[in-house]
Amino acid sequence: MQRADSEQPSKRPRCDDSPRTPSNTPSAEADWSPGLELHPDYKTWGPEQVCSFLRRGGFEEPVLLKNIRENEITGALLPCLDESRFENLGVSSLGERKKLLSYIQRLVQIHVDTMKVINDPIHGHIELHPLLVRIIDTPQFQRLRYIKQLGGGYYVFPGASHNRFEHSLGVGYLAGCLVHALGEKQPELQISERDVLCVQIAGLCHDLGHGPFSHMFDGRFIPLARPEVKWTHEQGSVMMFEHLINSNGIKPVMEQYGLIPEEDICFIKEQIVGPLESPVEDSLWPYKGRPENKSFLYEIVSNKRNGIDVDKWDYFARDCHHLGIQNNFDYKRFIKFARVCEVDNELRICARDKEVGNLYDMFHTRNSLHRRAYQHKVGNIIDTMITDAFLKADDYIEITGAGGKKYRISTAIDDMEAYTKLTDNIFLEILYSTDPKLKDAREILKQIEYRNLFKYVGETQPTGQIKIKREDYESLPKEVASAKPKVLLDVKLKAEDFIVDVINMDYGMQEKNPIDHVSFYCKTAPNRAIRITKNQVSQLLPEKFAEQLIRVYCKKVDRKSLYAARQYFVQWCADRNFTKPQDGDVIAPLITPQKKEWNDSTSVQNPTRLREASKSRVQLFKDDPM
């Protein structure tokens, strides 16, 4: 078969003085690269395709081809063949074996040359399959370059300038690492190259649905702008992936690389968001993309069972790198010891028993990142201010979608053509606008630029089993403003002067211990799954795995208003029987002594010194001209 010019491999300059191969030898003249009738990825070939490839190279010995079929030599095994294996397959001549080996090595080299290599600051040099590159080079994926990974956190941590784009590349890479490792350790799992490619695509595309400033958009803005809509960025990712596939002609490319679009697109979506349809009965396997014997594949990108997945591994490493925080979790070690075992008639990814402590450390790392960075008190208030600005601008921003239809910031999620155009750049569009209708939104963003932020008042927690319900969040500012501090104040504050931010901190599964949902195996019985309870690990592990933090901010920033806001806040904490703010005795020394539970006999504070501090505090504000 004669190749088209576009398919000719580029010739490299010779680096030695050896004579050229004579033109009548198969290794020089034969068409040894994949032809039009063969799949471009040799790893997808079965024995018949391997035989076809060898015949085209001039290797037509019946014994060789017969042994290839009988031994079921597939394309994936070609790089593993050496001279001794060829001899066993019936190639008796040493010269022929060398020619055959050279022929196959050229094929492998061509395949390697088609892989794109990028240099990632976290994972080093990453190889990307041509299909992944085709997906990356689309407007829908490139959009992720313009969405900050940590939203308003960049205004607090100057190194946190990374975006969803590079995180998505990292997750796609790690997904491939884990699924390849499982396949190599356990060939009986029959993980195909098609499975590998689908898992990598799911990792690559899992965050396509994020909006401006990442979690600020789906966690703060959408619930306020459209409270009737229960929308998540995972749902957005599935919709955007569908749009990416259809608008860029990706289905034929998927078929070219051995995928079956009808099944595999469904499988990729299910890995991102879970089952697309609820099963009729609980006992039924809820997924359509892969059968139950491939259930473990659904635990790689987004693990709904226990939260141990490659998404976390990448953002732990990447966020810590950019934040300047130490990452204590080693995902490479987890991959080394990961194994698939049968648990409750399902195949699940299990960890080695000795790794249980490291997994607790992983969830502790997650909690620590939330405390130190993701829920930083200044980062959160910047997210809140950006949300306020977007809400004020929502009615006046127009984004063109399919068919020329116009959408607002909050409704762009209904049309993926419009949503593709919605990124962090909307911040600058509002900030630099001259439209009088955007004046209020513009002023809020200017305050962020000038660092005139809403002021942090304090933090508290509910006591006992009490938790503030989500439906009560909206009424909390009014509660704070209704608290009547038993001190003389120069100003009176209203509900609209306060912002109350409720933060739910946990190990990823609300009150549950995620390790209770992890299966382990031991060295002596690697195919038998076991459970390990918390008490079997250490007596120093957490008793509770969730807590609620309540932070109060004041929109007024003058000193008298801030002093009043702190008195309102501490009084509210006392009225609601919340914990005493850590600096309560300093910011409200006349209020904290009135709460008996806050001043038990074990307190190390000196009452006399506390009274003196109170007098000093009152005197300070009394004489202050303000």
UniProtKB/Swiss-Prot annotation:
Question: What does its activity-regulation comment describe?
Answer: Allosterically activated and regulated via the combined actions of GTP and dNTPs (dATP, dGTP, dTTP and dCTP): Allosteric site 1 binds GTP, while allosteric site 2 binds dNTP. Allosteric activation promotes the formation of highly active homotetramers. Phosphorylation at Thr-592 impairs homotetramerization, thereby inhibiting dNTPase activity, leading to reduced ability to restrict infection by viruses.
Task: Describe cofactor binding as the record notes it.
Answer: Binds 1 Mn(2+) ion per subunit.
Binding positions for dTTP 2?
N119, V156, R333, R352, K354, H376, K377, K523
Q: Where does dCTP 1 bind?
A: Q149, R164, H210, H215, K312, Y315, D319, R366, Q375
Q: Where is this region: Disordered?
A: 1-36
- Mutation effect (Y315A): Abolished ability to restrict infection by viruses. Abolishes dNTPase activity. Does not affect ability to promote DNA end resection at stalled replication forks
Provide the SAM domain boundaries. Answer: 45-110
Instruction: Give the binding site residues for dATP 2.
Output: N119, V156, R333, R352, K354, N358, H376, K377, K523
Task: Tell me the outcome of changing M385V.
Answer: In AGS5; loss of function in defense response to virus; loss of oligomerization
Outcome of substituting T592 to A/V: Impaired ability to promote DNA end resection at stalled replication forks. Promotes dNTPase activity and ability to restrict infection by viruses
Effect on the protein upon substituting H167A: Abolished ability to restrict infection by viruses
Residues that coordinate or bind Mn(2+): H167, H206, D207, D311
Task: Specify which residues bind dGTP 1 according to the UniProt entry for this protein.
Answer: Q149, L150, R164, K312, Y315, D319, R366, Y374, Q375
Binding positions for GTP?
Answer: K116, V117, D137, Q142, R145, R451, K455, K523
> Subunit arrangement?
Homodimer; in absence of GTP and dNTP. Homotetramer; in GTP- and dNTP-bound form. Interacts with MRE11; leading to stimulate the exonuclease activity of MRE11. Interacts with RBBP8/CtIP. Interacts (via its C-terminus) with CD81. (Microbial infection) Interacts with HIV-2 viral protein Vpx; promoting interaction with a E3 ubiquitin-protein ligase complex containing DCAF1, leading to subsequent ubiquitination and degradation of SAMHD1.
Protein name as it appears in the record:
Deoxynucleoside triphosphate triphosphohydrolase SAMHD1
Q: Which organism is it from?
A: Homo sapiens (Human)
Q: What is the lineage of its organism?
A: Eukaryota, Metazoa, Chordata, Craniata, Vertebrata
Q: Which gene encodes it?
A: SAMHD1
